[in-house]
Amino acid sequence: ADIAVVGGAEAIIHPLPVAAFAQMKALSTRNDDPEHASRPWDADRDGFVIGEGAAIMVIETLEHAQARGAKIYGTLAGSGISADSHDIVQPDPTGSGQASAMRKALASAGLSPCDINHVNAHATSTPLGDTAEAHSVAAVLGKATDQVLVNGTKSMTGHLLGGAGALESFAAVMALLKRQVPGTINIEHLEEDLEVNVVTHTTDLPNGDLAALNNSFGFGGHNVTLAFTNANATH
C-alpha cells in the first residue's frame, strides 16, 4: 500500500487490570506522591504508573506524500523485532533480545550506531527493566553511547501499554523535527553506574542529519525497535 493509518490506544484504568498489575508487583506504590511516581532510572523507582491515551499517524511512501502535498514530519527508516522468551514478566538482565531488535532496526535502516543521536527508551520505571534496557542500549551503541541522548517519556505520560509504542514513536519523530530531546522528569538520584546518557532537561540536537531509535518491549520478552530519521536526512 502507498499509505496507511497506524497507531495505538489504551484505556485500561479499571479495578481488574489495576489489581492484576498490582498482584504482579509491577506498579509503583508511591500513592502519596503520584505526580512523581513514574521516575525511570531514578535510584528509588519502584514500578510503573498506568496511563491512558492514543497516538495516530499516517505513514506513506515519499512519492505519495509529495504528490498530495503532505507535511512530512520524519521518515520511518527501519524496524527490528525479537522474542527472547526469558520470563513472562521479568526482562532478560543481559538485554540480548532487546539488543537484537535494535541491531535489526539499524540494519533495516542502513544506519550504524554512530548515526544515532537519540533513543526514546521503553523505560517503564521498573527496577529491573530500566537497568536491563540501559545495558542493551549501551551494548548496541558501543563507543557512540556517550554521544546519544536517551530519555524516558513515560516519566511524563505514564505507561500507555498498548498505546505506548505509537505515542513514543511520535515523540521521537518530534524530537528530531524540533531538534530537541525532552528531559526525563522526576529523577532525584540517578541510578549509579548507569551505562547510557540519560537527559534530565531539554537538550538540543545538532544540525544536519539526525536519527533516533524508539524501543517498545513487552511481557514475555517480545521486543520492537523502530528507527527514524529527520525528513531530509541523507543517511
Predicted regions, residues:
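Conserved beta-ketoacyl condensing-enzyme motif
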Residues: A9-V18, P113-G129
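Short glycine/threonine-rich loop-to-helix capping motif typified by GTGT followed
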Residues: H86-Q98, T124-L141, D146, L160-L167
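Glycine-rich, charge-dense phosphate/pyrophosphate-binding loop(s)
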Residues: T153-M156, S216
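Condensing-enzyme catalytic core mediating Claisen C-C bond formation in acyl metabolism
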Residues: D32-A109, H118, A233-T234
